[in-house]
């Protein structure tokens, strides 16, 4: 092989190395720690969610945190925290060995825990790991106190993950010790060594209260109109069961199971007060509503069997048990619809006072959106109803005999609006993902971004080109209506580029180098081809050209003759 061919091969290898380096750089930019976790969260609509939560205790107290109590998210978030908590304490086992019944890991997924009637705490430990931090003893004390106080009221069991660590991680146990409450609906809530005893105690009190009402009507107390108004003003989320004298014990049994699912999120009340029923415009009983920041969300099913279907109730309340604008966590994402847009509020937590105020503002924006959307949908329903009546009049004018039958076949043209969920995230935790995806300074003022997770499009400005900040809620609402095409108006002028293109643009500094390498390789490859072959084709071309020229001259001379 000639020297020129070897040079061509070397230049091609050099070009391949440069291209591979640029591609790896782009992959590293996409899969940064924060970006990978948040991408899993937004894609959870269709992908697997990482088994970790956001630790709000390390950031700031959220709005109405005092009222939420056990609704605080106190789970482990970072690798550093996991490393600190991946310990086991002999004191914990000695002090609480009498309160916890050791069970095998296989029993976790058995019918025992999947049964509707079994519930209680399960302590996950790892006997192979030794204590590493002195604070662990204090953290374990809260677990020990809980088991001593409620050992005769709540079931306590223990699982050693030493022999099945991977299986424990699959069910979301990433730190030890972890105390998990399994309710009788198959759901679980994880508490770690970060969780204070007060939070554990409040959670256990609610469980004990439910246990004491077995066989009785639950909820036991009936609220009246004044109490209902106080709850609307003070409770961010609560559920209300409206009934009359016709309710049976079976109805309240399903409510008791439903209440266990709501433990730690929202309380459940009941009423037969006609004033409350009239206030909520309810015409058929029994009826179940969720009140979120004063706005009622009704359970659409009205039949008695549907009201007793616990799993159907749990599915309906999966997202309604959170505040109107919750923090985006894996638990929230699991309950989102796959076709739902996301209105993400990027909250800057550097100032605790400003952050709390921003979260309150986000809740107000979510409330305005809900009320405005209901107003628009009411108009859409009235328009659809008018179209149906026009169709009925048209049938009568044509003289059809079976007008009622034909009208029944014509379905009411109900509006099919796109869904959107308002959430907020901590811009400090996700600063890398925010800066790479949206090209927004995460440490800047808090702002809004509308996102379509299915196509990975986003909108960060209004139709006038103004950024979507929390100061102007009207711009946020107007842009949301435009993006969802609910009001029929056009999209914002500042349309964002696809997320995939955003990632590709991160390697634009390598584009000139890649182009130069391509041109050099192409020139060298052509120049070092077999010279004999090039000369052969060149001589053959010259010979053909001469032949054609002679033929042209002879033909022209013959024409002259």
From Swiss-Prot:
Coarse class of the primary localization is endoplasmic reticulum
Report the membrane topology from the UniProt record.
Answer: Single-pass membrane protein
Membrane side Lumenal: which residues? 25-509
Q: Which GO terms describe its biological process?
A: ERAD pathway
Q: Which GO terms describe its molecular function?
A: protein disulfide isomerase activity
Kindly list the places in or outside the cell where this protein is found, as annotated in its UniProt entry: Endoplasmic reticulum membrane; Golgi apparatus membrane
SUPFAM superfamilies, per database record: Thioredoxin-like
Q: What is this protein called?
A: Uncharacterized protein C1840.08c
